[in-house]
Amino acid sequence: MQVSVETTQGLERRVTVTVPADTIDSEVKRLLKEEYRHRRVNGFRKGKIPPNVLQKLFGREARSRAASSIMQSKYFEAVMQEKLNPAGAPAIEPKVNEPGKDLEFTATFEVYPEVEVQNLDKVKVEKPAVEVTEKDVDNMLETLQKQHADWKEVKRKSKKGDRVTMDFVGSIDGEEFEGGKADDFALELGEGRMIPGFEDQIKGIKAGEEKTIEVTFPEDYHAENLKGKEAQFVVTAKKVEARDLPELNDEFVALFGVKEGGVEALKEEVRKNMERELKNAVKAKVKEQVLKGIVENNDVELPKSMIDQEIDQLRKQAAQRFGGNVEQMPDLPAELFEEQAKERVKVGLLLGEVIRGNELKADDEKVDEIIATAASAYEDPQEVVEYYKSNNDMMQQVRNLALEEQAIEFVLEKASVKDKKASFDDIMNPKQQ
């Protein structure tokens, strides 16, 4: 077998392979003898078809099969021989495939780039210094109360936290516009669902009152015809309701499966859940900064085949997110996902090199810690732990996650890390800040 390698452009390689004629001719004869002679052919008994008849009837098909099989196997041999590291599937094309002649084919593919991770000391990370306070726990309990509250009609003016049911008609320059009208629309004041200024002017309204309010649509509003436009809404309040919060007592506590210890036991359970969620959120924020830092401080040539694969994955995820059948939905344009795909590929290559270059191995304690953290959210943690450990696929996912965390920790040891004081809401509810 003769092999030559050509760099066509960037990471693309074209391998030309020549296989001796007797190799493919022998495979064709084998196929004809072992498989095709058992075919049914009029005038011949099964298994008794002469070689010349087999060659005439099935020679072309047998040669095509033999060539396909040999090209695949010889491609892998050539890649190993030349110490190439393909980043995607090859495009294999036969050049010479005739009886009695050497089989010649080309395989075109991209190779993984040479990756060197540098400038880790230039990676800057602000690590949130935060803990769950008593006030945070009380706020969470109040949120739970609100989720289980009843709405009761009140006869006073509306205020923040109330729910106002209204009819409204919107107009611009005296003309009603599409989407600007609603009946029996329920709005909780303080949620920020409406355009700026709308809720503020609803506060203080009473049931039965009609009011005209003036607002300006934001410049980045989704409807092109409304961007930056001044509008008037005639609002008729039909009902004002206030939340009737349930008392913090044993009956309320029982809603959350707490059987003993009353309110204090619920508070402790809430605190534990908040601390677990906060720990994960802090870890995610740190990871985001680390990945951004290594991407910004390292250049890597990206294989197009890897970017295309990542685009396909992102496209499928988008279709699933919107509840569509991936096969039935039309292809979303690749451009929508290209930048995200490039970043994912670059992150994968850089983190992979951190792991490979520093000979990191999945730490058993780290693996157990990840499983224990995941299991702690369930009623029977031990059952979840046993499920993980009995499932090879799940364990491999956890080992990969552990390796990723260890790579992040390795970078953090070299990076410039500063603590930044923060509150629970800063981390968990940043949009509300």
Swiss-Prot record:
Keywords: Cell cycle, Cell division, Chaperone, Cytoplasm, Isomerase, Rotamase. Pfam families: FKBP_C, Trigger_C, Trigger_N. SUPFAM superfamilies: FKBP-like, Triger factor/SurA peptide-binding domain-like, Trigger factor ribosome-binding domain. It catalyses: [protein]-peptidylproline (omega=180) = [protein]-peptidylproline (omega=0). Residues 161-246 form the PPIase FKBP-type domain. GO terms for molecular function: peptidyl-prolyl cis-trans isomerase activity; protein folding chaperone; ribosome binding. This is Trigger factor. It comes from Idiomarina loihiensis (strain ATCC BAA-735 / DSM 15497 / L2-TR). The gene is tig.
